[in-house]
Each structure stands twice: as structure tokens, then as C-alpha cells.
Amino acid sequence: MGLSARNQLRGTIHDIQIGDIMAHVVVKVGDNLIESVITRNSAEELHLKKGDSVKVVIKSTEVMIQKD
């Protein structure tokens, strides 16, 4: 999938908490932790779980998660 966002970092899901509507995802990139809040539906569609390899996509207005 091509993206216009240039800030893409590979990492591993360090923690994920899925709520009724939203999911809080913590991704470890090197020695850093990056947090993102995404919809529950997105987390379920991507089958996100702790330890998954993902790509963090950072835009000026949001931080997205893409599963590798």
C-alpha cells in the first residue's frame, strides 16, 4: 500500500488496550515508545496483538498504525 506520509517507523506492539470504542496502542520503536489511539474496529480488523510487527505512520495531524 502506498502512502503519502513520509514519517514511517517500524516497531513492535509493546501494549494494547482495547476498549468499547477505541484502542490504545503502544509501539516500541528502538528505545522509544510511541502511543496511538485508534478505533476498536481498526484494531480488530488488523488483528493487532502484543508482539506484532507494525509500522507507525506519523502525519502532522495524527499517528496511524499499519500492520506489516
What label would you give each PLM region?
Residues 1-68:
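Non-catalytic connector elements of ABC transporters
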